Design a protein with these regions (language model features):
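N-terminal-biased segments
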Residues: 9-20, 48-58, 95-97, 195
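Glycine-rich, proline-tolerant flexible connector loops at the mouths of alpha/beta enzymes
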Residues: 35-63, 116-123, 222
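Short active-site-adjacent helix-start/loop capping segments
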Residues: 42-45, 70-71, 78-82
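Short glycine-enriched, charge-decorated loop/helix-capping segments at active-site entrances
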Residues: 45-50, 85-89, 127, 224-229
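Hydrophobic faces of well-ordered beta-strands that scaffold small-molecule active sites
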Residues: 4-10, 34-36, 69-74, 112-114, ...
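Active-site acidic/histidine proton-transfer and metal-coordination neighborhood
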Residues: 20-21, 27, 61-65, 78-182, ...
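Short histidine/acidic/glycine/proline-rich micro-motifs that form metal-
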Residues: 10-14, 40-47, 118-119, 155-158, ...
C-alpha cells in the first residue's frame, strides 16, 4: 500500500473536457483522485446549485471510470473573503462555503480547501482579521455538521504564509474539522523570506495537516513555475 495518494487539480486539465473525460484523463495519467474547483467565476459557482440529477451524473462518472473526486478547492473565497469589509461579499462567501460543503457531502468529498486570506484585494486590518476568525468559527461548525474536513491553505501573503500562522487559527477555532492544507511552494518562499526551515514549520502542524499542495515556486514568484525549474524540495516535504 502506498504511503499517500496523489490527486490532480481539475484546472490542470482543459476546461473543454466533461467530467467523465477529466476523470479518464486523470486515471490514464496515474493519479489516484481529482480535486474539483469552485473558483470565483460564475460558471464554477453555479455548480453549487446543480440539480440532484446533475450531481448523480458526476457520481455515476466516478463509478464508471473508477476515479473519485476526493477534495475540493474553494478559491472563490479569495474574492468573497471571510474577513471582507463589504458585508455582501462576506455574506456571499459564507453562502458559497455552506453550499460547497453540501456539494462535497453529495459527491463523497472528504476535504474542502479554503484559502488562508482574511482579505485579498483589500488591506488587511485588525477588523478584517477579527471578522475572518468569527466567520471561520462558523465555517468550522458547518463542517462539523457535514462531517467534512476544512483545510486552510497557506498562501503567499503575510497573513497566513506558514503552517505556524495557520495553526493559530486552528487553535482558536478548536474544531476537529478545521485543519491545514499547506502549499509547499508558498511555504518554501516564506522560508526564504523569514530565513526559516520549511520542514520545521510543517512539523508545527503535525496531526493537523489534511493534504499537501505540490506547487513549484521561485523566490518572489508564486505561480506558473514549471516543475523542476524552481527551488521547492518536494522529496523532503513529502
Amino acid at each position: 500500500m502506498k504511503k499517500y495518494s496523489l490527486g490532480l487539480y481539475e484546472k490542470a486539465m482543459p476546461g473543454t473536457l466533461d467530467w467523465k473525460e477529466k476523470l479518464e484523463a486523470a486515471k490514464e495519467a496515474g493519479y489516484d483522485f481529482v480535486e474539483i474547483s469552485i473558483d470565483a467565476t460564475e460558471e464554477k459557482i453555479a455548480r453549487l446549485d446543480m440539480t440532484k440529477e446533475d450531481r448523480f451524473e458526476i457520481i455515476k462518472a466516478m463509478y464508471e471510470v473508477g476515479m473519485p473526486i476526493r477534495t475540493m478547492c474553494v478559491s472563490a473565497l479569495t474574492k468573497y473573503s471571510l474577513g471582507n469589509d463589504k458585508e455582501e461579499y462576506c455574506k456571499r462567501g459564507m453562502e458559497i462555503l455552506e453550499k460547497s460543503l453540501r456539494l462535497a457531502d453529495d459527491l463523497g468529498i472528504r476535504v474542502v480547501m479554503i484559502p488562508g486570506y482574511d482579505v485579498y484585494y483589500e488591506p488587511s486590518t485588525l477588523e478584517t482579521k477579527k471578522r475572518f476568525l468569527k466567520n471561520l468559527k462558523k465555517a468550522s461548525e458547518l463542517a462539523e455538521k457535514a462531517g467534512i474536513q476544512l483545510g486552510l491553505e497557506t498562501m503567499e501573503n503575510e497573513f497566513m504564509n506558514t503552517v505556524e500562522k495557520a495553526m493559530k487559527y486552528v487553535t482558536l477555532c478548536n474544531s476537529n474539522y478545521l485543519k491545514i492544507y499547506p502549499d509547499i511552494g508558498n511555504l518554501t518562499n516564506a522560508a526564504v523570506t523569514y530565513q526559516s526551515d520549511v520542514l520545521e514549520d510543517m512539523e508545527l502542524g503535525r496531526g493537523n495537516l489534511t493534504s499537501l499542495h505540490l506547487k513549484e515556486t521561485l523566490p518572489g514568484r508564486f505561480r506558473e513555475v514549471p516543475y523542476g525549474t524552481g527551488h521547492v524540495d518536494f522529496e523532503a516535504a513529502i
